[in-house]
């Protein structure tokens, strides 16, 4: 294991490359206490981090109890390290710098991904706002459907009225009178009721028939008149007196 402590930016370069200001010298040549420096490095590193071990530039390297120690300074910046061999220490320092650089590089793309999420959220928002437009366009379709249904009903009513008019023109009476004729005589123009004396397609009583029949058919049973004459008389009575003249109406 090798521990390297760098006290300044300039010292980082010195620690990694192994180049230091001043001449390399053994601790005994610099007049330093190896045991004291080794003990400080192992048990009290804060004191070594606070200030250089001596004034001026120095480059002190020694081995104490099978552990290498290195103390360097260019007169302004300083560093120190210890471990099992300087080669291993240099490798450890280089690996640490590389790991830090890789970690910073790996963290940067994660920060870049955040705007993409924001853009995605912005893209989704217009899709939600489009929903009311769909509802607005559906309403005219419903109105158009209602209008179409109303038009169909009106058309059916017109067709029904036209059909009734056609029937009325072909038989001489309206649809209601046709129903009355079916109930009164089954449509038989010669039908006669012996008990009441009513006769004809619409079962006219004699007095009623005389009030609406042409002069040449008055005083005669309605059953003796042609169907067209009976129809005209029935329609006249219906228009002037209403359907209440027939019990079966």
UniProtKB/Swiss-Prot annotation:
Keywords: Glycosidase, Hydrolase, Secreted, Signal. InterPro entries: Lysozyme-like_dom_sf, RPF. It is found in: Secreted. Residues 172-182, 192-203 have a biased composition (Polar residues). This is Probable transglycosylase SceD 2. It comes from Staphylococcus saprophyticus subsp. saprophyticus (strain ATCC 15305 / DSM 20229 / NCIMB 8711 / NCTC 7292 / S-41). Residues 1-27 form the signal peptide. Residues 80-203 are annotated as: Disordered. One of its GO terms (molecular function) is hydrolase activity, acting on glycosyl bonds.
């Amino acid at each position: 294991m090798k521990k390297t402590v760098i006290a300044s930016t300039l010292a980082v370069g010195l620690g990694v490359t192994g180049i230091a200001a001043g001449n390399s010298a053994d601790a005994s040549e610099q007049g330093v206490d190896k045991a004291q420096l080794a003990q400080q490095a192992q048990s009290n590193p804060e004191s070594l981090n606070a200030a250089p071990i001596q004034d001026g530039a120095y480059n002190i390297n020694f081995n104490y109890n099978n552990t290498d120690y290195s103390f360097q300074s260019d007169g302004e910046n300083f560093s120190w390290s210890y471990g099992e061999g300087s080669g291993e220490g240099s490798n450890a320092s280089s690996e640490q710098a590389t790991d830090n650089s890789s970690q910073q590089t790996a963290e940067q793309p994660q920060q870049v991904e955040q705007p993409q999420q924001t853009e995605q959220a912005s893209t989704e928002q217009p899709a939600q706002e489009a929903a009311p437009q769909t509802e607005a366009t559906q309403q005219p379709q419903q109105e158009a459907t209602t209008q179409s249904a109303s038009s169909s009903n009106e058309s059916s009513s017109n067709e029904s009225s036209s059909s009734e008019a056609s029937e009325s023109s072909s038989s001489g009476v309206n649809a209601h009178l046709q129903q009355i004729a079916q109930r009164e005589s089954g449509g038989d123009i010669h039908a006669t009721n012996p008990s009441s004396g009513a006769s004809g397609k619409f079962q006219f009583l004699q007095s009623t028939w005389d009030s609406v029949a042409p002069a040449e058919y008055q005083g005669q049973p309605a059953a003796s008149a042609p169907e067209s004459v009976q129809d005209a008389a029935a329609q006249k009575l219906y228009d002037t007196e209403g359907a209440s003249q027939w019990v079966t109406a």
